[in-house]
Amino acid sequence: MKKKVVVAFSGGLDTSYTVMYLAREKGYEVYAACADTGGFSAEQLKANEENAYKLGATGYVTLDVTAEYYEKSLKYMIYGNVLRNGTYPISVSSERIFQGIAIARYAKEIGADAIAHGSTGAGNDQVRFDMTFLVMCPEMEIITLTRDGNLSRRQEVDYLNANGFKADFAKLKYSYNVGIWGTSICGGEILDSRQGLPESAYLKQCCKTGSEILSIGFSHGEINSVNGKVYDDKVEAIRAVETIGASYGIGRDMHVGDTIIGIKGRVGFEAAAPMLIMAAHKFLEKFTLSKWQQYWKDQVANWYGMFLHESQYLEPVMRDIEAMLESSQRNVNGTVTLELRPYGFSTVGVDSPDDLVKNKLGEYGEGAKGWTSEDAKGFIKVSSTALRAYYLNHKDELPDD
């Protein structure tokens, strides 16, 4: 009986090689499974299916996990305004976990003996896929031909060409990972720390001049409207923001960080929707959360992003952090306006029923209604007690006159 193997199939070079090699050289019954987190068009998915069969797959399936990805991860990333190193919206990092979970589920459903993926031995994805598979289907063998054989792109292209599968893999200067939460760009100038990416490297080009106002509405921290149009489907709301923002070339940057395996890595990205949505959300929170809600939410959100990146999504503490993040959003309601311009944007204003700037006690820099001048002087004097006590004993440490 043939060994049944599920390949996490993106249609790229490494996974194409994996499908063909396992089917042709090993004689395995290969099932190509493409886990879509919102980055594939209908045409791309159709091409993936056709290519999988050309490569020798016994079966092919597209696993659409975009809605699950939003409900179980993106929602909390927005609650926490999660940006790794203050820059990167953790696009690929978070996607891979849910792709791995979907692949593992499918492998169990069809009774597979093994799971294969195309990760190399130098990046984060090998950790994310392997850890997910080890937890969800520990009885299955994990096959990684590119990693185990330390294969070069040239070797894989030559093998595919020699066996009748013609593609332009070798001509690609950059490799892209496209998803609902942004596009990552690797290769080319990325490999030289002294260089940035040229305009031509970005998939979405700035095609607008001037400026325009964008409004984003939130209900309990979740996006629910774009320019006045209400969305029940949050993924579609994200797509709407992406379309508008990308037309201005917004959301481009370069992320430099530490990989899970310990080396430094650099990646370019374009992520208009994440940058605009989280900027609007964070701005709204400044008006609607207390000082300490903001402070502690930022602390746990930083850990949430770190754990996502480090392939620890299945760690039980993540459910506890999600509960805290969700609780913090009960009063994060309202509409934020932003002004967009080529390659940038700025926040403009907030309209919220929970706006704490609007209160009956006092208006910053104008006047106090909730206390008297004597109250203010007493508050300041008591607040200075610890400092005054210290410097009474350490007058030599006071600033020079």
What residue ranges belong to the model's regions?
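Nucleotide-activated chemistry modules centered on ATP-dependent adenylation/adenylyltransferase
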Residues: 2-401
